[in-house]
């Protein structure tokens, strides 16, 4: 979990912006989206191979 410490003279907006940035870097939202629905192992393998194919031919 991302955690930030708010400074004495720091506004709530800047602290929220900093928190969102740390969450983005940690990949919190992307992980949550991945685990939103169950994905069968066969589907995971298929997506992984398609992504590798895209990287290879790009």
From Swiss-Prot:
Regions of compositional bias (Basic residues) in chain numbering: 43-58
Biased composition (Basic and acidic residues): 31-42
A GO CC annotation given for this chain: ribosome
UniProt entry keywords in alphabetical sequence: Ribonucleoprotein, Ribosomal protein
PANTHER family noted in UniProt: MITOCHONDRIAL 28S RIBOSOMAL PROTEIN S21 (PTHR21109), SMALL RIBOSOMAL SUBUNIT PROTEIN BS21 (PTHR21109:SF22)
Cited Pfam families: Ribosomal_S21
HAMAP family in the cross-refs: Ribosomal_bS21
Gene label: rpsU
Any one Gene Ontology BP term: translation
GO molecular function: structural constituent of ribosome
InterPro entries: Ribosomal_bS21, Ribosomal_bS21_CS, Ribosomal_bS21_sf
Top-level taxon in the UniProt lineage: Bacteria
Protein name, as recorded: Small ribosomal subunit protein bS21
Entry keyword annotation includes Ribosomal protein: yes
Organism taxonomic ancestry: Bacteria, Bacillati, Bacillota, Clostridia, Eubacteriales
Family matches, as NCBIfam families: S21p
